Amino acid sequence: LKVFGFPLRGWSRTPKAIEGVEGFAGEAQFADFLKGTDILVNLLPLTPETAGILNYQTFRGLRRDGLDGGPVVINAARGGHQREADLVRALTDGTLRAASLDVFEVEPLPQDSPLWALPNCFITPHIAAASTETTGVAYFSKVIRAHEAGGPLPNLVDVQRGY
């Protein structure tokens, strides 16, 4: 989004310093983060704390005077983050201009879901992060080499945090 002139803002559980990104952290800064956000891209891990975070209250907190027609939500993380009834409400009452959803509370998205009928809801079949066999093998080989060399393994799950 930066190449299109959008300022970048990020929110996480703990403070982070990322060059070119205005950072917000913790529950206390969530509302301030939303107030300046036109396009909300969710890539959070799904934990008990983030389940249902994409809800009507969150959508109402997004910046109202930025994008023509209102804010946009993109969820490419986990379906458990969103409350689809709240998405339908926000997309039909104008709280959200649009949504792009790659994940759903129930997958595949049921044929009778009202999301299918909304012209401002763009649906993809859980393919936001497609991998090729070549990239998969290259990554796996890198992990094996690191393990054999006694080095640290990448992307280990912290079971206490849930991701």
Regions found by a protein language model. Name each.
Residues A17, E107-Y163:
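C-terminal helix-to-coil terminal segments
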Residues W11:
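The conserved SAM/SAH-binding core of class I Rossmann-like methyltransferase domains
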Residues L1:
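Aromatic pocket-lining residues of Rossmann-like dinucleotide-binding sites
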Residues P15-P114:
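Rossmann-like adenosine-cofactor binding region
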